[in-house]
């Protein structure tokens, strides 16, 4: 968004997101890569995609965002909610758990001898912040468009996630 939307390059953003949409579709449907996006399997990639779409909604319009990316948002959120991601596990408290013991999975991705220098496993704060944001944004956007079933389910999950986030992560 910073390289496109921030300078009114909406068409370029949409072009990039079309490539991302294809890659995300292939990934979540376990289909051969029609388009290759580096590290698509990492736990935060789909959540960052939702954040990018949220920036589009802010800069362009929520209605246009829902029309253009509503189905993609639904697909991403259902994929994560149903625990289909190979390295994101939705726990009963609403938080996402990821395993980074064998492979670096966050921005702290330095490796030595093929293993993470800083293995990050468990409830990773930035992943869960993105998750909570994705739940709230998608719930609101879908509700505005009349998709209340999924919107309500995401909102209930967001309530649970928000409470667990505050209980789990120290904020001093």
Give residue ranges: language-model regions.
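Catalytic cores of carbohydrate-active enzymes
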Residues: 81-93, 97, 130-172
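Acidic/Ser/Thr-rich, low-complexity mid-to-C-terminal regulatory regions of eukaryotic proteins
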Residues: 105-130, 136
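Carboxylate-rich helix-loop segments that flank metal/cofactor sites and access channels
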Residues: 92-112
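A generic structural motif
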Residues: 7-9, 123, 138, 145
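Amphipathic alpha-helical interaction segments
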Residues: 56, 115, 139-140
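Aromatic-rich carbohydrate-recognition surfaces in CAZymes
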Residues: 1-99, 125-128, 132
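Intrinsic-disorder/low-complexity, polar/charged segments
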Residues: 9-10, 120, 172
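Active-site oxyanion-binding pockets that recognize sulfate/phosphate
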Residues: 63, 121-122, 148
């Amino acid at each position: 968004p910073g390289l496109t939307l921030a300078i009114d390059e909406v068409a370029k953003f949409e072009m990039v997101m079309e490539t991302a949409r294809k890659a995300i579709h292939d990934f979540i449907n376990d289909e051969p890569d029609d388009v290759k996006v580096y590290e698509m399997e990492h736990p935060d990639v789909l959540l960052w995609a939702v954040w990018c779409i949220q920036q589009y909604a802010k800069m362009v319009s929520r209605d246009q965002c829902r029309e253009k990316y509503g189905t993609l948002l639904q697909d991403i959120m259902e994929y994560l909610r149903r625990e289909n991601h190979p390295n994101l596990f939705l726990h009963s408290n609403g938080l996402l758990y990821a395993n980074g013991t064998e492979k670096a999975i966050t921005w702290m991705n330095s490796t030595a001898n093929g293993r993470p220098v800083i293995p990050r496993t468990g409830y990773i704060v930035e992943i869960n912040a993105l998750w909570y944001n994705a739940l709230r944004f998608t719930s609101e956007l879908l509700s505005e468009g009349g998709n209340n079933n999924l919107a309500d389910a995401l909102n209930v999950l967001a309530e649970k996630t928000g409470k667990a986030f505050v209980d789990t992560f120290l904020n001093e």
